[in-house]
Every structure is written in C-alpha cells, then in structure tokens.
Amino acid sequence: PEIQKDFLKTLKFWADRGVDAFRIDVAHALKKDLSEPLRNLDVFEGLEQRGAKGKGILADRDELFKIYKEWRKLFNTYDPPRVAVAEAFVHPERLPLYASTKTLGQCFDFRFIDTPFEAGAYRNATQEAIELAEKNKSTCTWTLSNHDQIRHATKMGLNPAVNRRDWMLSNGTSHPLDMESGTNNGLAATLYILALPGSTYMYQGEELGLHEVTDIPESAIQDPQYLRNHKIDKGRDGCRVPLPWTKSGSSFGFGTGGSHLPQPNWFGSYSVEVEEKDAHSPLAIYRRALELRKELQAKEEIKWHKTSDVSVLHFSRPNGWHCITNFRAQEY
C-alpha cells in the first residue's frame, strides 16, 4: 500500500505540471508472488510459462489491474484525462486488460515488430489484434520499432532467413542488406499501420528511414546487454545512435561535442537537412501521412476487400478511406 501511494503521489506531481502522458515500462511486472516457499527459477519465466491465465509468478498477475484502476481514476481527474500506455510483454489475449478504459487505456502491440513483411502475415496479425480488442472493448496500439529492437527498415531489407543476432555480431557483413528495399518496405508498413483503427507509436529516426548502425566497435558499445549476455548479443546501441540533423559536422548537428555513440558517414544523406529538401524523402512521406491520418479519422472499424494479387492487401474505413499495400519486392 505504501508503494502504491507513492506511485500515485509521483504521477500526480507530474500530471499537475502538465505532463500529458505516461509510458509504463515493464508494466507486467509490478506484482509478484513472493509467498513461501519461494520458487527457484533458473531463468525469468517467459510468455510460454505465463500463458493467458494471469497466473505468472513474477509477471502478468491479475492483481496488477487493481493498481492500474487506481491510476486511471487519478488520470481521469484531469481535463483532458492523462494518457498512459503499457509496455507489457504478455500473451496477446492479455493485452486488452492493460488497454482497458478502466486501466491504462493503451498497451503497445508488438506483434508487427517480428511479423514478416508478407500480405498474409500482416492481415492475420491485424485481424487477430482488432478482433481481440473488440471482444474486450479495447483498442489497438500499433508500432514497428522501439529502442530495444533492430530498426525495422533494416529487418525488411534482410533475407528473412538470416539470423539477425549473428548478423549483428558480424557487424552486418555476413549477409547483404538491401537498404533501398528495406526503406521502401518500411515506408509501406508505416502507411499501412497509420491507416488502421487505433493509435500508432513511432520510434525516433524511423521518420528519416534510418537503418541500424551495425558496425559500432566493441570499445564504443554502451549497452550493458552486450556484456551481461557474455557478448553473444551485440545489444541495442545500433538503433540508439543520435539522429543526424545536418549533412555534416562533428555529430551531424546533434551537438557541438560529438556523439556518445559513433555515427556512420552515411548518416549525412539521411539527415533532416537533406530530407527536408526532397519532396519524396521518408521525412516528407511521414509528414504527409500524419496530416492525412488526422484529416481522415473515422470510426474504429475496418473492412477487407478482395484483390487479384495475394501480395496486395486492401482495406477501407467507414468514411471511404482506402488503404492498398503492395507487399511484393517490386513495383506493382
């Protein structure tokens, strides 16, 4: 009870000062079963062990939602109500419990992060998420990238059969990367999720079409995941390299004293300075897509339409807004 009171005090402190939203990190792990005898676990229990029952030992326990209901009561005392989004690695059937209007209201849906860029896979993932949200009177919260993942443009430019962890350990040299294809596929995926019902979160740098920085030297790696995992996983620094604002300079405009993580030379051509001058750049496409999304908002519904090509998906929203996505490797 004392910890819960302190959480509410802290949330209120920041909400009173105008903070609009809160991201709840590892939202599935605020409650644990510490009843004796304590269990002796060799590794942290994963999704397979926890399943969809809410009976995990260390995570995703049903007692969590009593806590989040109290938080929601606090958030709703503000006008407008404060937004909260859960980062919860849980069974898909559990996601709506975190995204309920009675709890946090939103929960990242990570299924697209590792969904192959294929029409069938995208449709199945979309339909499953929407049906689950509707069943629980919740909404979907889509994302393609975050600070813990290889940038999605890079994933989509690699052969799907490539072991990405081994590829990263080779500094991106063990298999070829098609950066152009990855960028184009990444843009198509973004336009797809922006047209879906629900909310969308974007990770800094994806609006520039940035790829993973794969060749950070060992001496410059800062992510403790690299050392903690005995160097069998290069870590997450490759997606955390500071953004390029200008096409040149000691840190491509990030600051005057250099960058805390090394930036590759190719960052200059992906800089804001360069892309703002190109009407067809990823930055221009993102800006226009966000404008259209705002203009075309409609009821949280979707209708699928048949296409003559299995590599093309077509859906519409109630106001006549249509989204047609080509998942083929070449132009249609």
Residue ranges and their predicted role:
Residues 1-332:
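Active-site and adjacent substrate-binding regions of carbohydrate-active enzymes
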